[in-house]
């Protein structure tokens, strides 16, 4: 009887440890969001065949930019990709495995997949520009494809952002 009790307790603890170790979306955000978005774009007939999923993923990757493009590179979804672990994505998706689990499998093959992070967006309506670093101010201008010729000090960058703010900020009503 004691042995049976110990087996049940150990089984419970193993299950508890497994759920706490499961990959969360914020641990691998680019992978989870990209896989989820890609899986949602597939039609039912494509979802059943892993070869069609691979072809669709390569087509999907041609339209991706920034972090998603890098994710595609790591998986082998681009022509210039050095390695290919595309079957680690396509086969689990054909089994209707959730994005978190797919990314968990991908992370075991290539940890770089989960090193990708989205950059935090700065809300210009609520942030105090004077408290930002010059690097962040330059990033705001760069994201807008604007430059600040002759800007040397933080105040110059702030002045330029304030000039361009009405053009680029989306104020919600």
Swiss-Prot record:
It comes from the Eukaryota. It is found in: Secreted. Its main location: secreted. The keyword tRNA-binding does not apply. GO terms for biological process: dopamine metabolic process; dopaminergic neuron differentiation; neuron cellular homeostasis; neuron projection development; synaptic transmission, dopaminergic. The keyword Secreted applies. Pfam families: ARMET_C, ARMET_N. GO terms for cellular component: endoplasmic reticulum; extracellular space; synapse. Keywords: Developmental protein, Disulfide bond, Secreted, Signal. Residues 1-22 form the signal peptide. Disulfide bonds join 28-114, 31-103, 61-72, 148-151. Gene3D superfamilies: SAP domain, Saposin-like. InterPro entries: ARMET-like, ARMET_C, ARMET_N, EF_Hand_1_Ca_BS, SAP_dom_sf. Belongs to the ARMET family. Required during the maturation of the embryonic nervous system for maintenance of neuronal and cuticular connectivity. Essential for maintenance of dopaminergic neurons and dopamine levels. This is Mesencephalic astrocyte-derived neurotrophic factor homolog. It comes from Drosophila erecta (Fruit fly). The lineage of its organism: Eukaryota, Metazoa, Ecdysozoa, Arthropoda, Hexapoda.
